[in-house]
Amino acid sequence: GPPCCLYGSCRPFPGCYNALCCRK
């Protein structure tokens, strides 16, 4: 599936959300 994080921002996908992605 697609990565949870793209371009340094929080990008949730269906069934793939990681709060750690929100870190800069």
UniProtKB/Swiss-Prot annotation:
Cystine pairings recorded for this chain: 4-16, 5-21, 10-22
Top-level taxon of the source organism: Eukaryota
Keywords (A to Z) from UniProt: Acetylcholine receptor inhibiting toxin, Amidation, Disulfide bond, Hydroxylation, Ion channel impairing toxin, Neurotoxin, Postsynaptic neurotoxin, Secreted, Toxin
GO molecular function, one term: acetylcholine receptor inhibitor activity
GO cellular component, one term: extracellular region
Tissue: Expressed by the venom duct.
Lysine amide: residues bearing it: 24
Family: Belongs to the conotoxin M superfamily.
Domains as described in the record: The cysteine framework is III (CC-C-C-CC).
Function: Psi-conotoxins act on postsynaptic membranes, and act as non-competitive antagonist of nicotinic acetylcholine receptors (nAChR). Is less toxic than Psi-conotoxin PIIIE.
Name of the protein described by the UniProt record: Psi-conotoxin PIIIF
Source organism (scientific name): Conus purpurascens (Purple cone)
